[in-house]
Amino acid sequence: MSSAFEAISVAKIFRRRWSRREVRALQNVSFTVEPGSIFGLLGPNGAGKTTLVKIALTIAYPDQGEIRLLGESVRNRSILKRIGYLPENPRFPSHLTAWQVLRLYGSLSGADIRTVEKNATKWLARLDLEQWRDTRISTFSKGMNERLAFAQALVHDPEFIFLDEPTDGLDPLGRMEVRSICSELARQGKTIFINSHILAEIELICDRIALMKSGEVIDQGTVAELTSARGGYEVVVPAGDGLSDWLHEKNVSFTFLDGHLHVQAKDRASANWIIDALRQKNIEIESVAVKRRTLESVFIEKVSGGEENPAAKGTKNT
């Protein structure tokens, strides 16, 4: 098996019944996910992330292309027994207890009931729900319900796990535990596919990332690859009389911090010009540093059509 997940030219069009208007939810989407990795799918609301996952789970069907999971087409529905899924807004029968939920959903996957019960005990303890195992979930908080849904996705010991906004409703300790579990599962050879818009979570945990916008994959790679381009330069000098006015006149961006001016340059040529000008004014330069782009800045640039923050382009910023 070369890929745990493979999207091949997937397209999906939704048609409005009355207006006959077409909404292209997915347009020729293609990418792969390697076995034993943690993959993140990022994009704004309406980008097509959830539609793609629904097609992978056969909840929806493509108008073009196909998705393969664990080396097999999802048209072979038996593959779904090896898949775990945490939906964005999990809902369980409110009259059931936590134990009953895990036992029911685990058995629906076709797994041996003894394996399901063993795993249910394990994940209830790991996710701090053991004391609530016989409590009806109608009394659960949002965070407790989210942890139960995470346990549900794992209770049948799947090889591939889809997680849709897995840390929604969790406190910082809960989010850290989810990241820890995902890393452990990946080390065991399982593949994790995270659909999220929380950039910090994705940046912390994912091996590779794909960015989606308007139904298309607009970029993909590791965090290092996506953020490798320089985000400009920063020149730090002591704040002196008249210097800020001079920078304003030259339309150069800077910030004031702890008695120093942090002068921004969008590229090497701009940085060299600023350095030469400061030296001609006999101003001591304390440091010059290359600024690396963050995943957040890459995301904003990509989904907004390439427009970066004006402060990165040499405009005033006081």
Which residue stretches match the model-derived regions?
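Primarily ABC-family ATPase nucleotide-binding module
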Residues: 1-3
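ABC transporter nucleotide-binding domains
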Residues: 5-7, 12-213, 219
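Short coil/turn segments
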Residues: 66, 91, 240, 266-269
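Short, surface-exposed acidic/glycine-rich loop or hinge patches that mediate macromolecular interfaces
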Residues: 73-74, 217, 238, 268, ...
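Short phosphate-engaging motifs
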Residues: 75, 201, 242-243, 270, ...
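Active-site-adjacent beta-strand anchor residues
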Residues: 95, 236, 264, 288-289
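ABC transporter nucleotide-binding domain
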Residues: 178-265
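C-terminal coupling/interaction segments
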Residues: 266-318
